[in-house]
């Protein structure tokens, strides 16, 4: 990690952290800085330690929160930690005009941090796997998928991105429970696969992998440490 990225973290007034699956982020942060993340006790949403405020939020919301708070409090140094896939999901949303220019972010994968898994297209056992592999190839009509990553899905077939033919709609965009609905409806799902245990235990098949996911540092674009 460069001194710039290290300074981003150590000079931050507020650091936003995921409130679930915290271990990869705490481990990565401890390996590159001297920051000690305090334990979150009871139902407190934030803790102050050594001049910094630590706030726990949903990991998927970190990019938007960092951009919004930094825009509202320009004199503060706001930094977050999130999965790299949520950063891409947020940034791809900006391409559709949903995000104001002062809500743009930058992110940096933490070097040497362990992979958190990969975003992949998975199919339940009720689906003809080989037929679906052909249908999601570039050049075919986009196949609808159930997902928590609608922007990744919609942009997956565009030039320079993942080159897969999939899409999504609001009724198939969830905040969780993707595999269950995919199984019930006999549809493909686009989701984060960590260890693969859920995929195996529920007889899903991985059709294609879109990207590896790593712990990432999130800042507002143009922020100067």
Regions picked out by a protein language model, each given a short descriptive name:
Residues 1-225:
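Domain-level signature for soluble enzymes in the chorismate/prephenate branch of the shikimate pathway
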């Amino acid at each position: 990690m460069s001194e710039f990225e290290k300074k981003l973290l150590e000079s931050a007034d507020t650091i936003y952290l995921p409130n679930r699956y915290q271990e990869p982020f705490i481990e990565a942060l401890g390996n590159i800085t001297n920051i000690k993340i305090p334990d979150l006790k009871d139902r407190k949403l934030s803790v102050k330690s050594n001049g910094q405020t630590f706030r726990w939020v949903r990991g998927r919301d970190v990019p938007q929160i960092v951009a919004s708070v930094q825009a509202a409090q320009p004199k503060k140094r706001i930094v977050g930690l999130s999965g790299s896939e949520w950063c891409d999901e947020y940034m791809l949303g900006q391409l559709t005009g949903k995000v104001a220019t002062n809500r743009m972010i930058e992110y940096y994968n933490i070097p040497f941090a362990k992979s958190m898994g990969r975003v992949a297209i998975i199919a339940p056992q009720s689906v003809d796997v080989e037929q679906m592999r052909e249908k999601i190839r570039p050049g075919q009509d986009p196949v609808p998928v159930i997902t928590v990553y609608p922007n990744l899905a919609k942009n997956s077939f565009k030039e320079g991105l993942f080159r897969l033919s999939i899409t999504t709609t609001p009724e198939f965009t969830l905040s969780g429970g993707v595999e269950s609905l995919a199984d019930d409806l006999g549809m493909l799902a686009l989701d984060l696969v960590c260890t693969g245990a859920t995929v195996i235990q529920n007889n899903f098949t991985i059709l294609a992998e879109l990207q590896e996911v790593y712990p990432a540092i999130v800042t507002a674009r143009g922020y100067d440490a």
